[in-house]
A protein has these predicted regions:
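Intrinsically disordered, low-complexity terminal regions
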Residues: 1-286
Length: 286
């Protein structure tokens, strides 16, 4: 069964919402939800038709659909989960799809299905097996691993190291590279693209940076970067770059073509396989 078929089956299942008894747990305990399974808690928890709040460790059955989920500590979800507001702090592992209005994760987060949210904010380490679809914004700081595509109607903002097996499609794409390599194997398409290296001061003594050259800088590897308007790149290795106003900053390597429609700037430390070509107009194809 494909990822889309699993998501359709999941949404069909959620149309019949189960009854969740209101229960407060202190120490350890469990709550049985008819037709779904059991909520297990070791620590403290509150379970109701509107909200699930767990501190400590616990597990949720697949098919949970409430307004708010908040988990601090270690949590596992044995299938799909949906909430308007979802907040995981610590370690969270979801065996299925995640559907949320706002999804916030801090620590270690893993989803074995697809993540669909209005806004997703991730701090720490996140892994998503079937892609991320954000109606508005995706912000990730730390490490992000996505086995599918990443799509956002507004902004994708990545800070740290990221690995995306598919493509990134957004209105705006921004990245600040850490000292580690990042990869986007399917390319990047957006209205504006801005990729910059993280400033490394090296070892600072009495306010003076020394040994800067011994600290490794991050690099982004991808195929094509296509923007409708502005492109600014640092420490990027790619096949093609296309945009209206294109700035190839320091440390870049473009293996095939750079095309632009209005302005072009190339830093002397960057290498191009061929001189930039001017086009009548460019489109991202989003």
């Amino acid at each position: 069964m494909s990822g889309e078929e699993r998501m359709e089956a999941y949404e069909e299942k959620l149309r019949s919402k189960p009854t969740i008894p209101t229960t407060r747990i202190s120490g350890s305990g469990k709550v049985h939800i008819e037709g779904i399974g059991e909520v297990r808690v070791a620590g403290a928890g509150f379970v109701s038709p509107e909200e699930i709040d767990i501190s400590g460790s616990g597990s949720l059955p697949g098919g949970i659909r409430v307004k708010k989920v908040k988990c601090s500590g270690s949590i596992s979800v044995e299938g799909d989960i949906e909430a308007e507001d979802m907040d995981f702090a610590g370690s969270a592992d979801v065996e299925g799809h995640v559907k949320a209005g706002t999804l916030s994760t801090a620590g270690s987060f893993s989803a074995h299905g697809k993540v669909k949210a209005n806004v997703m904010k991730s701090a720490g380490s996140s892994r998503v097996s079937s892609g991320i679809d954000a109606d508005d914004t995706l912000r990730a700081a730390g490490t992000l691993r996505v086995l599918g595509d990443v799509k956002a109607k507004n902004l994708v903002d990545l800070r740290g190291a990221f690995q995306v097996d598919g493509e990134i499609v957004a209105d705006r794409f921004e990245a600040r590279l850490s000292r580690h390599e990042s990869h986007v194997r399917g390319g990047i398409r957006a209205r504006d693209v801005d990729v910059r290296r993280k400033e490394s001061e090296g070892l600072v003594i009495f306010g003076i940076p020394i040994l800067r050259r011994f600290f490794r800088e991050g690099r982004l590897y991808t195929t094509s970067i296509i923007a409708e308007e502005k492109v600014y790149l640092e420490n990027v290795s790619c096949d093609n770059v296309q945009g209206r106003d294109v700035t190839i900053g320091q440390g870049c390597n473009v293996r095939r073509k750079v095309t632009y429609s209005e302005s072009i700037s190339v830093h002397p430390t960057s290498t191009l396989a061929a001189p930039p070509e001017k086009l009548a107009s460019v489109r991202s194809g989003k």
